[in-house]
Amino acid sequence: ILDYRMIFAEKFLLFKTVAKGVALETRNLHKRVGKQKKVILNHVNCQIESNEFVAIIGGSGAGKTTLMNAMSGFDKDVQGAVFLNGINLRENFQHLKSIIGYVPQQDIIYENLTLRKMLYYTAKLKMSADTTREEIDAKIEEVLDMVELKEHENTYIRKMSGGQKKRASIAVELLADPKLFFLDEPTSGLDPGTEKNLMTILSKLSKTKDKTIIMVTH
């Protein structure tokens, strides 16, 4: 199952790591909307390997976000199937949703807190109830390093630039250590230099942190 192979030996159930990351496959994703039954997804088949960084590119209204929502399992009103390492996502969504991260186009952060405070309160919600303060602090340090915001940890969110706020939103989702990571137009409104920096960070996450990353962009 996902990164593990279950082996039953007499009275013991063993778990063996067999792969890193999550591979995603779509089979015949199809969706129609409206009274005219306009086709938004037309039997989409694709395969994304584990730890790949993939961009879904297209113009406005092309169905990019619709496809991503179908891939993530959050849109149930889609024909076809999605498999994560061979496991049907729709049939096992409640068990698999914890490994899925999603960053919407609108930043998901509280602007009247410092970055560290915001991450701390978010960690209290996202991490298990028995997580210690030391473990939370260690996780915050880790995600700050991942998104290259360590030097801004005591900065109020409202004083951050657009690119920094986007990285803060990504840090929020990284607290739960998702293996499959979706981002909706993360570079929207960013200048070319900031966009390049963000793309470099995302590429690094996929290569060094065992994350499969799928983003939507124009």
PLM region descriptions:
Residues 120, 135-152:
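Conserved ABC ATPase "signature" region
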Residues 170, 198:
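Hydrophobic anchor residue at the start of the ABC signature
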Residues 173-174:
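ABC ATPase C-loop
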